[in-house]
């Protein structure tokens, strides 16, 4: 297969521009990989498709406020977008405008210094005075909602472009498969005997980018920092040993777990594992950790669409997408979801 095989027509009318009125009220398309059978349900009914002994793995990364404008002392306007966290500090920005090392930038009474230019349109910033670059962005910047929403961030996005269990700040895009998780759904899952575990992967802007080459081996995958706690690794091992299923909530969880598969299945390994997930998953990949996937409906030519096709099977996935369009499902970050079993 080629990248062009993952192009499809997504009508603008099927892109959800805003979150649903009530969190968790979206629809859920369920696809059985073994048969290709499709069922239509609700996200709030997820527990009805899981079994006692299954394990749900969530990404607890928190979206940080990441988009603001700053000004040079001469008056030049520079757009800044904070990039995802790698390690301890979050001080890399994507900038639009003209910058050079040593420049000063003013924003909201704060002064940034351009410490270094590290790539096309990417700079390392520092901030004068107390606090960090991340502190300034958290105080004054806007939420970094996806560009395909074609609108500015609004007050509703501060709450709804964030999961209810977000803990670890560092993402500049939400792990959207779990945006519709609610406390009530967690209660229903636990009552059924489904275990819930978490890990952290800080989602980057690369998640929105279409692939611009036509051969998989020509694409350079973006890297995202992740941490999988020891208790989550232990739960995965126990679930597998007892015949349960590991359900990844989202492509971010999938990438982290599959990238760390060697450690997950190393019975002598102890402690948490961290790394930079640069794994590019596309049809032909053999999954080692996950047994089911809860995810959104993805954009054409995106790496997350190819990952989903690798898990579901491309033919079955595109049949499911055609059905979703026919039944008027909403696509992308604020839209409906699919569960692939």
Curated annotation (Swiss-Prot):
InterPro entries assigned to the protein according to its UniProt record, in alphabetical order: QueA, QueA_dom1, QueA_dom2, QueA_sf
Enzyme class: transferase
Location in the cell: Cytoplasm
Name the record gives this protein: S-adenosylmethionine:tRNA ribosyltransferase-isomerase
Organism: Chlorobium phaeobacteroides (strain DSM 266 / SMG 266 / 2430)
Gene Ontology BP terms: queuosine biosynthetic process; tRNA wobble guanine modification
Gene (UniProt): queA
Cellular component per GO, a single term: cytoplasm
Subunit comment: Monomer.
KW Transferase (keyword) present: yes
Keywords from the UniProt entry: Cytoplasm, Queuosine biosynthesis, S-adenosyl-L-methionine, Transferase
Chief localisation class: cytoplasm
EC number of the protein: 2.4.99.17
Listed pathway(s): tRNA modification; tRNA-queuosine biosynthesis
GO function terms (MF aspect): S-adenosylmethionine:tRNA ribosyltransferase-isomerase activity
Family (UniProt): Belongs to the QueA family.
Role played: Transfers and isomerizes the ribose moiety from AdoMet to the 7-aminomethyl group of 7-deazaguanine (preQ1-tRNA) to give epoxyqueuosine (oQ-tRNA).
UniProt xrefs under Pfam families: Queuosine_synth
Gene3D superfamilies assigned: QueA-like (3.40.1780.10)
Coiled coil: none
Matching HAMAP family: QueA
Entry annotated with the keyword Transferase: yes
Record's catalysed reaction(s): 7-aminomethyl-7-carbaguanosine(34) in tRNA + S-adenosyl-L-methionine = epoxyqueuosine(34) in tRNA + adenine + L-methionine + 2 H(+)
């Amino acid at each position: 297969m080629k990248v062009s095989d993952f192009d499809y027509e997504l009508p603008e009318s099927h892109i959800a521009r805003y979150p649903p009125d009530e969190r968790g009220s979206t629809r859920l398309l369920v696809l059985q990989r073994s048969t290709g059978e499709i069922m239509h349900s609700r996200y709030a009914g997820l527990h009805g498709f899981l079994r006692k002994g299954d394990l749900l793995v969530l990404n607890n990364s928190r979206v940080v406020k990441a988009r603001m404008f700053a000004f040079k002392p001469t008056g030049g306007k520079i757009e800044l977008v904070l990039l995802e966290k790698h390690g301890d500090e979050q001080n890399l920005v994507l900038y639009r405008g003209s910058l050079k090392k040593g420049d000063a930038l003013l924003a909201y009474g704060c002064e940034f210094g351009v410490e270094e230019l590290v790539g096309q349109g990417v700079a390392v910033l520092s901030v004068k005075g107390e606090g960090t670059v991340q502190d300034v962005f958290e105080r004054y910047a806007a939420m970094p909602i996806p560009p395909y929403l074609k609108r500015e961030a609004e007050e509703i996005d501060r709450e709804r472009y964030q999961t209810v269990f977000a803990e670890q700040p560092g993402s500049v895009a939400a792990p959207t498969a779990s945006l519709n998780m609610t406390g009530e759904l967690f209660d229903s899952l636990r009552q059924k005997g489904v275990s819930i575990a978490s890990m952290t992967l800080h989602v980057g802007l690369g998640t929105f980018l279409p692939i611009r080459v036509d051969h998989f081996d020509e694409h350079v995958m973006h890297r995202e920092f992740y941490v999988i706690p020891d208790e989550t690794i232990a739960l995965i091992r126990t679930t597998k040993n007892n015949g349960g299923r590991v359900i990844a909530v989202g492509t971010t969880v999938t990438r982290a777990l599959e990238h760390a598969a060697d450690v997950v299945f190393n019975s002598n390994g102890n402690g948490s594992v961290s790394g930079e997930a640069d794994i590019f998953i596309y049809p032909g990949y053999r999954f080692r950790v996950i047994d089911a996937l809860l995810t959104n409906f993805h954009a054409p030519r995106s790496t997350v669409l190819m990952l989903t096709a690798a898990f579901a099977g491309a033919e079955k996935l595109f049949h499911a997408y055609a059905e979703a369009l026919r039944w008027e499902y909403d696509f992308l970050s604020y839209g409906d979801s699919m569960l692939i079993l």
